[in-house]
Design a protein with these regions (language model features):
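Conserved alpha/beta-domain cores
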Residues: 1-146
Length: 146
């Protein structure tokens, strides 16, 4: 199996777009980012479908060779400065003095500024497990705190 596959690597290398830039594209101010996002999402009915499909296929490629052994996939755990480097990301990320302890991990998922982005991650994981059939994918929640 796989002890830890980091979802943010799949997002960074394959998806390349901040999920909130697909949820709220009108907030992306950079023309270059808008153009690049339009190219990546061309052919999709909704820009968010690009995120879900690309992320699901990337995770499925990780899970396939190890099936039926467990593949632990950690939900995204970008720090704000890392998320800002994704296409369209600057519009959605605050400047933090110390991103290592800032808005990341589990606390990001339920916050109003990322809840819709987290829903896209969940849709991708559901597709991998229920539609593609890789039930060997096990979800890990990062950076839980009280």
């Amino acid at each position: 199996g796989v002890g830890l596959a980091r979802m943010e690597f799949v997002i960074n290398h394959l998806v390349k777009v901040h999920p909130m830039a697909l949820v709220a594209p009108e907030k992306v101010t950079s023309e270059d980012a808008r153009r690049a996002i339009a190219e990546l999402t061309h052919g999709y009915a909704e820009p968010t479908d690009y995120f879900v499909d690309t992320l699901a296929l990337g995770i499925a490629k990780l899970a396939a060779p190890f099936h039926p052994q467990p593949v632990i996939v950690r939900l995204s755990d970008f720090k704000t400065n890392e998320y800002a480097h994704l296409l369209g990301g600057e519009a959605f990320e605050p400047d933090e003095e110390n991103p290592m302890i800032g808005w990341r991990g589990a606390s990001r998922y339920y916050s109003p500024g990322y809840k819709a982005g987290f829903a896209l991650e969940c849709r991708a994981l559901r597709r991998v497990r229920e539609e593609i059939g890789f039930e060997n994918v096990i979800i890990m929640v990062p950076f839980c705190r009280t």
